């Protein structure tokens, strides 16, 4: 079983983190450890490779960064758990689809830990609430880049955020899509206590643990030439 290191980077400027991901991936060797970075960003909009700038409806004073992941526009900000997956997919024997499935399953498992029901939607990557007054609202977004069989970028899970910046965009390219966080969804821990922004570290490590479990479950389930994009 190939280990995965968990690195908590805390609060970090998006551009600095993006540059670090690219450098890490470019400098990888056959023995470079697989790593998940846990990060929280200051407010920033990011636009994917094929993203349409028209989905930024009202930029205001939040910067826009064009990046090399897939997908459209999204928002990162305080109170959001971001997990970047820097993995050698060939070494792990993972297809990209299996990686996406693992990420989405890990988010669903994390939310279930906090008594929030969620689900995938066909053709719309990310995780959505499956019950309650905000059923259908998006609570997590994902976007990936595969280079030489190695992944970077990852997934963002909304914990306790100022959600108003999401109204300034068409989230992931979908006009009018409601976006919520775990607080809005009524997330509670095993003792019944409502989660809040102070739970960032705890929630981030639950997500990391679920990501590792899902990735290890899928390891070597696919041929080693899987990730070639």
UniProtKB/Swiss-Prot annotation:
- Reaction(s) catalyzed by this protein? octanoyl-[ACP] + L-lysyl-[protein] = N(6)-octanoyl-L-lysyl-[protein] + holo-[ACP] + H(+)
Recorded E.C. number(s)? 2.3.1.181
Q: Name one GO cellular component term.
A: cytoplasm
Positions contributing to substrate binding: 69-76, 141-143, 154-156
Q: Where in the cell is it found?
A: Cytoplasm
An example GO biological process term is:
protein modification process
- Protein name (record): Octanoyltransferase
Please name the source species: Ralstonia nicotianae (strain ATCC BAA-1114 / GMI1000)
Gene that this polypeptide is encoded by: lipB
